[in-house]
Amino acid sequence: MNEKLRELNVEFLFSAVLQLHTMEECYDFFEDLCTVPELRAMSQRIHVAKMLSEKRVYSDIVSQTGASTATISRVKRSLDYGCDGYKIVFERMDAEAAEKAEAASGETDGKE
């Protein structure tokens, strides 16, 4: 973790985010906290990170996200040399999606 980030205001923000339980709560909180361009920039970066982690090529990422190659390069640097924050989130999201898919297939398997 970058020690430059460790300060009370940042920890307060992270504690606040950890209090959110639903997608609707996230929408409400982040709409209050951020401007629309800030939210779009963050969502674009995480989408770029996901595509890079799936080994997608820059041209596909540019066309699907509208991100500049400079943004893609910065995100790639974070994936390669960062604190593995993206990796942790993507692993958890993938595990949750797999659990939901398994539960859904179990529901359909039992139906006649």
Language-model regions, residue ranges each:
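Intrinsically disordered, low-complexity basic tails/linkers immediately adjacent to helix-turn-helix/homeobox/MYB/SANT
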Residues: V89-E112
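Short alpha-helical "recognition helix" segments of helix-turn-helix
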Residues: D60-T65, I72
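Residues at alpha-helix boundaries and the short loops/turns that link adjacent helices
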Residues: L20-E24, V36, K55
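General nucleic-acid-binding
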Residues: M1-L20
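Short, amphipathic alpha-helical "recognition" segments used to contact nucleic acids or chromatin
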Residues: M42-R56
